[in-house]
Amino acid sequence: MATDHTSDAPDPKQRDLESARFRRDTGYLTTQQGVRVDHTDDALTVGERGPTLLEDFHAREKITHFDHERIPERVVHARGAGAYGYFEPYDDRLAQYTAAKFLTSPGTRTPVFVRFSTVAGSRGSADTVRDVRGFATKFYTEQGNYDLVGNNFPVFFIQDGIKFPVLVHAVKPEPHNEIPQAQSAHDTLWDFVSLQPETLHAIMWLMSDRALPRSYRMMQGFGVHTFRLVNARGRGTFVKFHWKPRLGVHSLIWDECQKIAGKDPDYNRRDLWEAIESGQYPEWELGVQLVAEDDEFSFDFDLLDATKIIPEEQVPVLPVGKMVLNRNPDNFFAETEQVAFHTANVVPGIDFTNDPLLQFRNFSYLDTQLIRLGGPNFAQLPVNRPVAQVRTNQHDGYAQHAIPQGRSSYFKNSIGGGCPALADEDVFRHYTQRVDGQTIGKRAEAFQNHYGQARMFFKSMSPVEAEHIVAAFAFELGKVEMPEIRSAVVAQLARVDDQLAAQVAAKLGLPEPPEEQVDESAPVSPALSQVTDGGDTIASRRIAVLAADGVDVVGTQRFTELMEQRGAVVEVLAPVAGGTLAGGSGGELRVDRSFTTMASVLYDAVVVACGPRSVSTLSDDGYAVHFVTEAYKHLKPIGAYGAGVDLLRKAGIDNRLAEDTDVLNDQAVVTTKAAADELPERFAEEFAAALAQHRCWQRRTDAVPA
């Protein structure tokens, strides 16, 4: 259950939510009308075996409410997880660009609610599918609610919102049999891609490791569109929004994703929840790319094109503030499911551009809430309520919670003293611009280069990231049944990069496509690679320590302490869950879980504890041996000390392993024969350094059977 935060000093939004909260673990059971009941297990009948009576209003209320508990799920982004927190600007450097106070008031913490999500799958689908991730943030500002409704990709698959229904129809389960669920690896999506080259840049992101985040806490977020900041004088500046995680950008491996989907389909939402509950609050830095209006046409692409990025090397990202998530919701449905984001929820100082995808989102998000949340009053739901004062002339409608007072509900009026009145300060004013032209159903020529940035993305990858992209295309297209679709996609890839197309074709058994005329001098953007960025922290990383009776208690406790000092989470896994293990030299070690019910894919690293009897038991257990082998195959740091080194040999790890008490680190396999109170701190240091790099990309494990 969620941590009890009632004693915390609440922010304005938490104070607002208090009026809607009630505790189920106190008081007496009542009906919806507040009538106490003394029996709820049997309906009212005539005698013990007679007919049930309709006059049992309590039973009818229970069943009727149950029958109506479900609401329509979101058409996209149905599966999600959310959390509360705050945003705080570093300084007032944006004051010259925007009138938005929450961006320009250092020391002011603006409450936020963030919802992360997958896109294609239904509400009950797995977290670790290959997909875009939603990253939507609701800022409860003093000037009203502002929603930054972004993704973990900076680009989208289409340029014009009129194509959104067909894109979603293509990626969703095919209509004749409702298969596959939460997957892009099927004919209709790739048929769409082969015929719509504007999708290719986003498809490159989808085939990359960016589509497989290790954690919501370890992925970037982007506003996708070019927005406009407007200052107090009405002057505009184009802006792109970026969220950068403090923990770095890290991903799972595709084989891990598929296994986690079965082992723990709630993997990402559980990770977010547990991190917040344990006080390891996720944090992101908000950055902006600013482009003066005079420079609108100085790029080789159109700023209004949502399938393009502004390379950070051309326009650096300016850090302007931080966001911290520090509270889990009290009720998933009431908060995470009923939260309603809308790209048109803006505040003074932030405005739109003529991005044709953004314009349709501004219509669609409001429209969809009307059916999903049962009418026009969804903004009154507790999670959606602004902390700013709300006074409108809109009234009535389903689920009206407010009780407006007074006779007038229109403007202008004299009966109500002219109120609610129009303000002349701190108001939203639409950006003033001249617009003229002929009515035409056509996109600008600057929108037509669909291959250049897709090529830039691929060329900016590290070798291992490029390998993963090739493998992803081969996997996805290998699931496509119609060979002509596979060939058509490969032909499109040839216009992105001939080597990419050739490698994918080879893996599919297709002839190498003819070489296309491509610009080999295409620029690269190092900022696009997440591997070259590395890492410098192991905070919240999960380490599994394998042990059994006879374990070296002193050495294990020492290692655990050294890792926890660095912020890692260490769990002892044994053949049986719970209880304690008897130490080989006395003492006991608490067991957290059993490795028979867990898996290496749920951890970032594995360590085998010392203790001859413990290691002997583990060596005879196929689960334990596979646990180590699988983690090794997935390039994770592996550690062993004392007799634990012997289990690595049993697991088939052929790296150089320690033969004495010196610490040896060979491709993130860290070993020493030292143990107990002689376990050197350098062992922990080397292991932590390897873990901070996330994986050892130099390790070749294709032949490892796991």
Curated annotation (Swiss-Prot):
UniProt keyword annotations, A-Z: Cytoplasm, Heme, Hydrogen peroxide, Iron, Metal-binding, Oxidoreductase, Peroxidase
Leading EC class: oxidoreductase
Gene designation per UniProt: katE
Organism from which the protein derives: Mycobacterium avium
GO molecular function: catalase activity; heme binding; metal ion binding
The UniProt record lists the keyword Iron: yes
EC number: 1.11.1.6
Official protein name in the record: Catalase HPII
Gene Ontology terms: cellular component: cytosol
Active site positions, chain numbering: H77, N151
Domain of life: Bacteria
Reactions accelerated catalytically: 2 H2O2 = O2 + 2 H2O
Cofactor(s) needed for function: heme
Region: Disordered, residue numbers: 512-532
Gene3D superfamilies given in the database record: 1.20.1370.20, 3.40.50.880, Catalase core domain (2.40.180.10)
Family: Belongs to the catalase family. HPII subfamily.
UniProt-annotated location(s): Cytoplasm
Role noted for this protein: Decomposes hydrogen peroxide into water and oxygen; serves to protect cells from the toxic effects of hydrogen peroxide.
Xref: SUPFAM superfamilies: Class I glutamine amidotransferase-like, Heme-dependent catalase-like
Biological process annotations from GO: hydrogen peroxide catabolic process; response to oxidative stress
Cross-referenced InterPro entries: Catalase, Catalase_AS, Catalase_clade2, Catalase_clade2_helical, Catalase_core, Catalase_haem_BS, Catalase_immune_responsive, Catalase_large_C
Residue numbers binding heme: Y365
